[in-house]
Amino acid sequence: MTDITMRQLLEAGVHFGHQTRYWNPKMAPYIYGARQKIHIINLEETLPAFRDALKFVKEVASKRGKVLFVGTKFAAREIVKEEATRCGMPYVDYRWLGGMLTNYKTIRQSIKRLKELEERLENEENLVGMTKKEILNLMREKEKLSANLAGIKNMGSLPDVLFVIDVEHERNAVQEANRLGITVLGIVDTNASPDNIDHVIPGNDDAIRAIRLYCKAIADTIIDARSVLELQKDEEAKEEKTKAKTTAKKVVTKKAKVAEKAQAAAEKKSEKPTTEKRPTKEAAETKETSEEPKTKEVQQPIEASKAEAEEGK
């Protein structure tokens, strides 16, 4: 996260407020004093508030949240567009359309129409058979829509945070965000009210250097948070690859073991019919000895019966 110092705030002129006659009494806690009828903002209040806001933006960006940059005043337009595109966030730099958040469904239809016009005007084949007046009307419609909606063309859904330069000038945007419960992070000058601003950053909202400092710090914080996210993704992908490799090796080894066991079993089966058991000499002798007494026992009663028959004669 980018670290903001007191020197940077002083060099950018963040401490210069509006003329004393235009002040808002609700900003009294953030005012240090007055010099030549101009209020001086207390940077000891600005610095911690800005750092807290950057921490909050980092948390939102690390969860893939969207931060909508809003700065339609002339001094902020170019800076808001440049820094928002650098960090890949949506922005509103020309005019805040009523219902841009609260009536987002109709805004989506306008965005769809803008994309259709861009695709149609890119290919010359689509313009065949059209008159010059019809082509000019399409180009004017496209320019009008792109001026208001080019920054939120790829937003996709409602933002998570609204970062506003000059909350007094962009009070319609703040009101819509409050209705929808969207967190508002705003640069509040001495002529504005800090009410309904979730993260108040007291500071100069007119000086170009100050506006650039705010927007650059927010954009750098978002880029840092996204880079950390990408590193974590790469590490997770590497871990998954290593796990997949180890599991694949285990499966291969198991299959090899099963194949070896099957092969061994097949070899045993093939060996059984070829190896017939032949009776050994000892087994044959034991059989003969076991058969001899049986023959003797059978012969004895036969001889006795023969002797009795001879005596009778």
From Swiss-Prot:
<keyword id="KW-0689">Ribosomal protein</keyword>
<feature type="region of interest" description="Disordered">
    <location>
        <begin position="234"/>
        <end position="313"/>
    </location>
</feature>
<keyword id="KW-0687">Ribonucleoprotein</keyword>
<dbReference type="InterPro" id="IPR023591">
    <property type="entry name" value="Ribosomal_uS2_flav_dom_sf"/>
</dbReference>
<protein>
    <recommendedName>
        <fullName>Small ribosomal subunit protein uS2</fullName>
    </recommendedName>
</protein>
<dbReference type="GO" id="GO:0022627">
    <property type="term" value="C:cytosolic small ribosomal subunit"/>
</dbReference>
<dbReference type="GO" id="GO:0003735">
    <property type="term" value="F:structural constituent of ribosome"/>
</dbReference>
<dbReference type="GO" id="GO:0006412">
    <property type="term" value="P:translation"/>
</dbReference>
<dbReference type="InterPro" id="IPR018130">
    <property type="entry name" value="Ribosomal_uS2_CS"/>
</dbReference>
<comment type="similarity">
    <text>Belongs to the universal ribosomal protein uS2 family.</text>
</comment>
<feature type="compositionally biased region" description="Basic and acidic residues">
    <location>
        <begin position="234"/>
        <end position="243"/>
    </location>
</feature>
<feature type="compositionally biased region" description="Basic residues">
    <location>
        <begin position="244"/>
        <end position="256"/>
    </location>
</feature>
<feature type="compositionally biased region" description="Basic and acidic residues">
    <location>
        <begin position="266"/>
        <end position="297"/>
    </location>
</feature>
<dbReference type="InterPro" id="IPR005706">
    <property type="entry name" value="Ribosomal_uS2_bac/mit/plastid"/>
</dbReference>
<dbReference type="Pfam" id="PF00318">
    <property type="entry name" value="Ribosomal_S2"/>
</dbReference>
<dbReference type="InterPro" id="IPR001865">
    <property type="entry name" value="Ribosomal_uS2"/>
</dbReference>
